[in-house]
Curated annotation (Swiss-Prot):
Note describing how the cofactor binds: Binds 1 [2Fe-2S] cluster.
Gene source species: Arabidopsis thaliana
NCBIfam families: fdx_plant
Domain 2Fe-2S ferredoxin-type, first and last residues per copy: 55-145
Transit peptide: 1-52
Subcellular location: Plastid, Chloroplast
InterPro entries reported in the protein's UniProt record: 2Fe-2S_ferredoxin-like_sf (IPR036010), 2Fe-2S_ferredoxin-type (IPR001041), 2Fe2S_fd_BS (IPR006058), Beta-grasp_dom_sf (IPR012675), Fd_pln (IPR010241)
Cofactor(s) it depends on: [2Fe-2S] cluster
Protein name stated in the entry: Ferredoxin-2, chloroplastic
Entry's family note: Belongs to the 2Fe2S plant-type ferredoxin family.
Name of the coding gene: FD2
Molecular function GO labels: 2 iron, 2 sulfur cluster binding; electron transfer activity; metal ion binding
Record's keyword annotation contains Metal-binding: yes
Keyword hit for Electron transport: yes
Organ and tissue specificity: Expressed in leaves. Not detected in roots.
Length: 148
């Protein structure tokens, strides 16, 4: 009798093909959307979502030329350290000249620094601890002695 009940239950079951539920971007964790689409958001830029840019930063050091990739929201000194490049620094706050370099080509945003004056910035000096790349950039390092 048990076999009869089981066979009637199997016969009475209908198989309906279900379509997958649509996925909303809002249902994904923000980390997922960032990695999927190369997007980032943050309070530093008003909470807006912006496209992430990565630039090539070439360092001309006394030991030779070294190149790293650096996101536009990472200080060039931090990117160098992550790549194992040893560059000079002290305060890491843009308020001294230990990490000074000189931009040979390209551009950086160093609005976080408070040490260099407009004339020094105009001459191409940069504090690597407080500079974000805004394009591919080449920087001569170890320039603290050249700042007058």
């Amino acid at each position: 009798m048990a076999s009869t009940a089981l066979s009637s239950a199997i016969v009475g079951t209908s198989f309906i093909r279900r379509s997958p539920a649509p996925i909303s971007l809002r249902s994904l964790p923000s980390a997922n959307t960032q990695s999927l689409f190369g997007l980032k958001s943050g309070t530093a830029r008003g909470g807006r979502v912006t496209a992430m840019a990565t630039y090539k930063v070439k360092f001309i050091t006394p030991e030779g030329e070294l190149e790293v990739e650096c996101d536009d929201d990472v200080y060039v000194l931090d990117a160098a350290e992550e790549a194992g490049i040893d560059l000079p620094y002290s305060c890491r706050a843009g308020s001294c000249s230990s990490c000074a370099g000189k931009v040979v080509s390209g551009s950086v945003d160093q609005s976080d620094q408070s040490f260099l004056d407009d004339e020094q910035i105009g001459e191409g000096f940069v504090l690597t601890c407080a500079a974000y790349p805004t394009s591919d950039v080449t920087i001569e390092t170890h320039k603290e002695e050249d700042i007058v």
